[in-house]
């Protein structure tokens, strides 16, 4: 299952809907060393009306592509210590994601030191030179990073990393302020991070974002169970 996704076509597909993040990392209950369980999550998301999928690793992306014909925001989480960025942190991960036909490649666009020694604008330029038609999403943690990444040529800006860097707001809530400020610059914003309740989804859309990614609240059973159990402890 594959089709050509332009920026306009992708926006038309995901605008106003829910993109479901289907991820499981080693050590988590839904991670299986022998085969990916994420296609089951993706199929359930499709049946519920999801407009797209966010997935991690070539293995999961390929498996998901076999069962749903939705656009996929793809990432590869790979540590490069001592540097902090680990979401599609080098061209190696970009090459792997392009090879498996990922619709949109998301990457860490924070201004933290990178393993490859490049600044974000240089990384974006290298990707665009090598893959001029590849759609890109910058995962950022604050306004300056979002504006910088968009000016450097990304197609979408995600609020994914707000709360996960020392230069961003530390909160258990979604960063609604960042969503609004980015959207006010007419940037196609994909809201992501700590969106746990339907009311938060509605609020994100009221701020002018293009689309919304929801992950743990839908596809991480341990997190979902803990949210209930913690209120009765």
Curated annotation (Swiss-Prot):
> Is Electron transport one of the keywords UniProt gives this record?
no
Q: Which keywords annotate this record? A: Carbohydrate metabolism, Isomerase
E.C. number, please? 5.1.3.9
| InterPro entries in the cross-refs | Aldolase_TIM, NanE, RibuloseP-bd_barrel
Catalytic activity field: an N-acyl-D-glucosamine 6-phosphate = an N-acyl-D-mannosamine 6-phosphate
Q: Name one Pfam family in it.
A: NanE
Question: Which pathway does the UniProt entry assign to this protein?
Answer: Amino-sugar metabolism; N-acetylneuraminate degradation; D-fructose 6-phosphate from N-acetylneuraminate: step 3/5
At the top level, the lineage of the source is Bacteria
Does the record's keyword annotation contain Nuclease?
A: no
Q: Name one GO molecular function term.
A: N-acylglucosamine-6-phosphate 2-epimerase activity
Q: Which first-to-last residue range defines the signal peptide?
A: none
Gene Ontology biological process terms from the UniProt entry = carbohydrate metabolic process; N-acetylmannosamine catabolic process; N-acetylneuraminate catabolic process
Q: GO CC: one term?
A: cytosol
Q: What is the role of the protein in this entry?
A: Converts N-acetylmannosamine-6-phosphate (ManNAc-6-P) to N-acetylglucosamine-6-phosphate (GlcNAc-6-P).
UniProt-listed HAMAP family: ManNAc6P_epimer
The similarity annotation says: Belongs to the NanE family.
What is this protein's name?
Answer: Putative N-acetylmannosamine-6-phosphate 2-epimerase 1
